[in-house]
Structures are given as structure tokens and as C-alpha cells.
Design a protein with these regions (language model features):
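Basic, amphipathic alpha-helical segments enriched in Lys/Arg and hydrophobic/aromatic residues
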Residues: 2-25
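Carboxylate-rich, polar loop motifs that coordinate divalent cations or form catalytic acidic clusters
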Residues: 27-500
């Protein structure tokens, strides 16, 4: 704005000088020759240029700065007056219809943009929800909402019937996670390593349950850690004693090129990259399985740690281990080991999970509060902790999460607390909350959940304010300077152009 003001000032001063000469000399055909300064063409060009500058200020296009958070926003708080009895929200999703769903301590809420509707346990519904404390929710291909409760029970909410439908169980084992696959298959993983595979009929949404465990004789051995589906709709079951593949109702165990048949190898991670399935296993083993054949290629990393994540990046493939940092495998085949020994503030260097976000940022999550950041652009490794009003590390029972909104703003919540946005210019986290206090997160406050909807609104559930919606107001004026080093340069002047 400072540059545009200088441009306008220059033209105003020039116009005043021209007007002065115009008043001193009677107008004639020889006016320009007499003054050696001014002609009518220049006079009107300057007037038109000045008004163009004014119009540009008033009607500048709304072009947000990439990755920059708008300084202005409005906040809407939701409470019992809006139909939300308990605003402590553990999870938020937006379904394929655009409806928002909230997993709360008081059941499931649906928001249609105007009103909230609550669904919770009902004494008259004997087969329905029995615990109103919901932890996680996820939508399947058919629009049903799967719910994991605080007591480790699991239900499917049918939006058409508006009822909770229980999962049939043969045992009372607790569920630990829900895995929804792209083809509509849902896997419910139990704490004991067994699993329930749920097949939904598209015509009436009826469910068929299939049970997988060594106890059911559907697995020869092993406890299921995770489930993955490849692009050919084959399901991979990763266990602590090998890996299985399920296709066309046929379950087979995958043989590995470097292993004896009697050897039991724990597997931790699977992903598809180009024409390969990558599998992370124990003792630094990485397997590449061709989608078109049965060949597996074995890569041995120089570590005895387990490979728990395999992530593509601009630097190459990143192999994250559980106890020995991570490895970068570049396009030339070179493998570089990055250890965490330099992080003196990190008390436990065990890695639980990893995530790569925009800006080439690798985030590592540990058993202790905080998060480790490796910047692939600057090659800088740092450990980040949220701090309270006394400068102490935040230590709330809240997990790490990160997501990017439609304005390219990266939102990050370190484990333990301190919801922030990433400052891409200075490569650091800036704490964010709607409070006007300089310390955004105090010891008596925490962020339970955060989510950005398709309209660009940021939803937050916090200890003090409960559920709130933040609507950012974009800046209307943005200045483009061709040569920012010196605003006085001719390249930066705004002039009107006469076309003949």
C-alpha cells in the first residue's frame, strides 16, 4: 500500500504543477512551447492515470497470499442455545453431501449449515448405542458413519434410518481402530489382533460380517496390525508373523524371497508407489512387491530397528524406523541416515508415527509431548513443544494432527497441545487461538479437535470455549511491485497507455 501511495502522490504533484502553469499562461496553440513543460496530452494522461490508481485501490482483486493466515476473522460460538449440549468434540468430518458430523461426549451431532441435530443412546433401542462418549468417526463409500466409542465398542450410523446399528461380535474383545477402504469394505481391528471385515450390500446397506484371527482358523498365525488396499482392489493384512493378501475371497500368505518358510517376520507398514507395493518390516527390512507379478525385492537398511513408515518426498523415499531415526533413499540409490541424537530436548527418541505435509516437511511423533520437524528444504532438524503461560511444555492428553486448508495454510497440532499454523516464510510454528491474550494456549486450555470444511471455515473444539467456527476474512488489497528493491524505479510506475 505504501508503494501505491507514492505512485498516486507523484501524479498528484505533477498534476498540481501543470495546473499552476495552466493558470499562469493564457491558453494558445503555442502553450507547450512557451512553458517547455506541459502539453494537453500529458495533462489528461496524468488525470486518467491518477483515477486508475484510485480505482485499483478500491476494486483490487481478492488474491490471497499463499500460506499466509488472514489477519481478520469472525468467531461463532456454539452452545446449548444453538442446539449443542456439549461442545467437547473429539472428531469432525464432512460427508460427501457436505453435512458436518461431530463426535462429542454427548453423542453424534449433524450440522446442515443452519441447525444441529443430536443422535445418542436411547433406552428404548436395545440394540443401539450404549455409550455417548464418541472418539472417532469416519464415512464409508455408502455414506454411513462408523463410530468408535470411549468403551471400545463400535457402531454404524445409518443416515437414512437415523439409527445406530451394532456390530455383531463373537467375543467381547475391544475395538481399537476403524479402517475404511475405497471399495466400501470396512475393517474393525481389535486389541487382541483379531479383526472383523464388514461387507455392505449397496442395494439395502445390509451388513455381512467376516471374522479373521488364528482362533477362527481364518489366519494360520499372527495378529493383525493394519490393513491396506492397493489399486487392483487387493487387501493386504499386515501381521506380527507375516503378510497376507485377500482377493476374490481367497486369502493367501505372501512368500518373501529372502525368508525361510518357518521364519515369522513382523510387518508394520504398506503403501503403493508407482508399480510397487512397499512393505516395511522388522530389523530394517523393506520389501517391494510388483503389482503385476509375484516377485519381491528386498532392501536391507543398516539398522536393526523396525520400518514403521515409508513416505515419498522431493529428496527420495523416506524410511522411518521406530527407534533409529529415518533414512533417505535418493534417486541415485544412495541411502542417508538421519539420527535424532542432536535433539537434546527430546527425552524419548522412539518414533510412533510420521507424516509429510506441504512445504516438504517431515513430522515425527513420539511417546512424549511435542513433535520433531525435519525440513527437507533447509535440512534442519528441530524438536517443537507447545508452551503454557509459564513457559512449561504443554502436556495435555491430545494427539498430533496436521492438515492444509484451501488457502494453503498448514495447521499443526503437536502432541500434548499447542494448535498452530506454519509460518512458511520463517519456517516455524505460530500458536493460534481466538483469545486476544499474548499466550494462546494456557495450562487450563486444550484443543480437542480441529477441522477445515469445504467452505474454508476452521472449526475448533477447546476446553474453555467448546465448539467454535472461525471464518477468515481475506485481505482485499494486495500490492504487486515488479521491482521491489526500489519503489522509485521507472519499472514500478503506473502509466496509462494510448493505443492508436
Amino acid at each position: 500500500m505504501e508503494y501505491l501511495s507514492k505512485v498516486a502522490k507523484q501524479h498528484i504533484l505533477r498534476w498540481i504543477k501543470c495546473r499552476k502553469y495552466f493558470d499562469e499562461y493564457p491558453f494558445s496553440a503555442n502553450f507547450a512551447k512557451e512553458t517547455h513543460y506541459f502539453d494537453m496530452k500529458t495533462y489528461w494522461v496524468d488525470i486518467l492515470t491518477f483515477f486508475c490508481v484510485v480505482i485499483l485501490c478500491l476494486f483490487a482483486a481478492d488474491v490471497p497470499v499463499k500460506g499466509a493466515i488472514p489477519q481478520k476473522y469472525s468467531v461463532t460460538y456454539f452452545s446449548s442455545q444453538n442446539g449443542v449440549e456439549d461442545g467437547l468434540v473429539n472428531d469432525i468430518i464432512q460427508d460427501h453431501k457436505g453435512l458436518l458430523w461431530f463426535a462429542t461426549w454427548n453423542g453424534l451431532y449433524r450440522f446442515d449449515g443452519y441447525n444441529f441435530k443430536n443422535y445418542k443412546s436411547n433406552m428404548e433401542d436395545l440394540g443401539g448405542l450404549t455409550n455417548d462418549r464418541l472418539l472417532d468417526i469416519v464415512e464409508d463409500k455408502f455414506g454411513c458413519i462408523w463410530v468408535l466409542c470411549y468403551d471400545s465398542t463400535c457402531y454404524r450410523f445409518n443416515p437414512d434410518k437415523e439409527v445406530f446399528e451394532p456390530v455383531i461380535q463373537k467375543t467381547a474383545n475391544s475395538f481399537r481402530s476403524i479402517s475404511v477402504l475405497p471399495n466400501g469394505i470396512v475393517w474393525l481391528l481389535r486389541e487382541d489382533g483379531s479383526a472383523v471385515r464388514v461387507v455392505t450390500a449397496p442395494e439395502d446397506l445390509s451388513m455381512t460380517f467376516q471374522f479373521y484371527s488364528s482362533r477362527e482358523n481364518t489366519l494360520s498365525t499372527g495378529k493383525i496390525r493394519s490393513v491396506f488396499m492397493d489399486s487392483k482392489l487387493r487387501e493386504w493384512l499386515l501381521t506380527d508373523e507375516g503378510v497376507y493378501r485377500l482377493y476374490d475371497s481367497e486369502l493367501s500368505i505372501i512368500s518373501l524371497s529372502d525368508c525361510r518358510k518357518s521364519e515369522k517376520i513382523p510387518f508394520y507398514f504398506a503403501t503403493e508407489l508407482e508399480e510397487y507395493i512397499y512393505l516395511g518390516a522388522h530389523q530394517g527390512k523393506v520389501y517391494k512387491y510388483l503389482l503385476t507379478g509375484e516377485l519381491s525385492i528386498h532392501t536391507q537398511l543398516p539398522t536393526s530397528a523396525s520400518v514403521i513408515s515409508i513416505l515419498p518426498s522431493v529428496a527420495g523415499l523416506i524410511y522411518v524406523t521406530d527407534s533409529d531415526g529415518f533414512f533417505i533413499h535418493d534417486s541415485l540409490g544412495e541411502i542417508r541416515h538421519v539420527m535424532l541424537d542432536s535433539l537434546s530436548l527430546l527425552k524419548d527418541k522412539t518414533i510412533e508415527s510420521a507424516k509429510i505435509t506441504c512445504g516438504d516437511l517431515l513430522w515425527l511423533v513420539h511417546p512424549v509431548p511435542g513433535v520433531t520437524l525435519f525440513d527437507l528444504k533447509t535440512q534442519r532438524l528441530s524438536f517443537i513443544e507447545g508452551k503454557d503461560e509459564l513457559g512449561r511444555p504443554l502436556n495435555t492428553e491430545s494427539d498430533f494432527f496436521a492438515f492444509e486448508d484451501r488457502n494453503d495454510i498448514l495447521w499443526v497440532h503437536p502432541k500434548g497441545g499447542g494448535f498452530s499454523y506454519f509460518d512458511s516464510q520463517n519456517r516455524r510454528l505460530i500458536p493460534f487461538n481466538t483469545t486476544e491474550q499474548p499466550v494462546k494456549w494456557k495450562s487450563n486450555d486444550r484443543c480437542f479437535a480441529a477441522f477445515v470444511d469445504k467452505q474454508g471455515n476452521l472449526w475448533m473444539s477447546t476446553q474453555l470455549n467448546r465448539l467454535k467456527r472461525i471464518t477468515f476474512i481475506p485481505d482485499k488489497f494486495h500490492i504487486y511491485t515488479p521491482t521491489p528493491q526500489d519503489v522509485e524505479l521507472p519499472d514500478n510506475e503506473i502509466r496509462s497507455e494510448e493505443r492508436r
